[in-house]
Design a protein with these regions (language model features):
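Structural detector for internal amphipathic alpha-helices that build alpha-solenoid repeat scaffolds
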Residues: 1-12, 21, 32-45
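Amphipathic alpha-helical scaffolding segments comprising HEAT/armadillo-like alpha-solenoid repeats
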Residues: 12-24, 47-52
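Single transmembrane alpha-helix segments in multi-pass membrane proteins
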Residues: 57-101, 135, 139-150, 227, ...
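Membrane-embedded helix boundary and interhelical linker motif in transport proteins
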Residues: 88-135, 315
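Alpha-helical transmembrane segments within multi-pass membrane transporters and channels
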Residues: 112-159, 165, 300-305, 336-337
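Cytosolic-side transmembrane-helix boundaries in multi-pass membrane proteins
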Residues: 144, 150, 154, 169, ...
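Helix-loop-helix "hairpin" substructures at the membrane interface of multi-pass membrane proteins
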Residues: 194-271, 300
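Inter-helical junctions in multi-pass inner-membrane proteins, predominant
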Residues: 216-217, 221, 247-287, 293, ...
């Protein structure tokens, strides 16, 4: 009896399996032992449920961190230019492929540095995707400002072209991006809860990128110009702000941040030509829910969506959970069209 009661302090699934026979009258004739075993099982189930909920919340934070990296750049470009960039997800994909190429290059040229290839891939992915973003803004998107439908169709076409280009260059199959040893394994918090090092590293990396973005937007001339153009483009131009250059640099910054998100994604899952397609819609939801151009709103919306997604999926299924989240967002936007954190100001007609 004392042993069965003592086992109730455990949170191990194996202990739960060990106690189950003691609740059966055919296996255990003593009623007091059966009652103690039932009480111990309930305690273990509560602890295991807590571990499962914490695990789902952590997975939600991990998903939210990826959505945040994708949505940060989208919030900048959409808030500044009003452009619905359907090719933004492909910046994630290009960033992930840049990480894969850096891994291959280091394996051939400098194998002693292969363990640190994600760190080398970060600036490479940022520069590549930022360059592509600035080129797209300069050559195509700039000529479509004020024409949202044409911009939507053009960026969707660019998205399809980039996907097909990657298929032609690297094949339609997923490529293997291996985690280095220092990102493998995890830390065991509870018997049924292990936090993987790669996801913890991605969370820490997202916080660094968030601080980096905040510093750029609030402590640099580019950030001041971006905020000025976002609030009143005509007035900013009258004050001497080079709006065309600001548009190009902001588009490059947003694309570069998405490229960094691609490097993070490469450490969490498969890398393939359609990688970005799975995140573009959720990224737009983050921007709309958080408030256009609002950094704090994007953070709250990204982590909130990620946690709700991961908690609802086991309970209701992936499809029904997604539908419920969409309905909740629609109802919220009807009450607050400007999102969680709207810009405060007065409009003069």
């Amino acid at each position: 009896l004392a042993a069965v009661t003592l086992l109730g302090h455990s949170a191990d699934p194996e202990t739960q399996a060990l106690l189950i026979p003691f609740t059966d009258a055919q296996h255990e004739p003593d009623a007091a032992v059966r009652e103690a075993a039932s009480d111990s099982l309930q305690k273990i189930k509560h602890r295991l449920l807590l571990g499962d909920l914490l695990g789902q919340a952590f997975m939600g934070l991990s998903l939210g961190s990826v959505l945040l990296l994708a949505a940060l750049g989208l919030a900048i470009t959409y808030g500044l230019l009003g452009v619905i960039n359907m090719a933004h997800g492909e910046m994630l994909m290009i960033g992930a492929y840049s990480c894969w190429l850096v891994q291959l290059a280091l394996a051939q040229l400098a194998p002693q540095w292969l363990a640190f290839y994600p760190l080398v891939a970060l600036p490479v992915a940022f520069l590549v995707t930022a360059g592509i973003g600035m080129a797209l803004e300069r050559t195509i998107i700039r000529h479509l400002y004020g024409r949202p439908l044409e911009t939507l169709l053009a960026t969707w076409g660019i998205s399809l072209m980039l996907i097909q280009l990657v298929r032609m260059l690297f094949g339609a199959q997923n490529v293997e991006v291996a985690n280095p040893a220092w990102l493998s394994g995890g830390v065991q918090v509870l018997p049924n809860l292990i936090l993987p090092w790669n996801r913890l590293a991605v969370l820490a990396f997202v916080l660094l990128v968030l601080c980096f973005t905040w510093l750029i937007l609030n402590r640099t001339r580019l950030g001041m110009n971006v905020r000025a153009v976002t609030q009143n483009r005509a007035m900013a131009a009258c004050c001497g702000v080079p709006t065309g250059r600001v548009d190009m640099l902001a588009f490059g910054l947003g694309s570069g941040i998405a490229g960094l998100g691609g490097v993070a994604l490469s450490q969490l899952g498969n890398v393939g030509p359609e990688l970005g397609q799975g995140y573009i819609i959720d990224s737009f939801l983050v921007v709309v829910l958080g408030g256009v151009g609002q950094l704090a709103g994007s953070v709250a919306a990204a982590f909130g969506l990620g946690i709700f997604n991961k908690i609802l999926e086991p309970q209701m299924g992936a499809v029904l959970g997604k539908i419920l989240i969409l309905v909740m967002i629609i109802l919220f936007i009807q009450k607050r069209p400007q999102g969680l954190f709207a810009l405060k100001g007065r409009v003069i007609d």
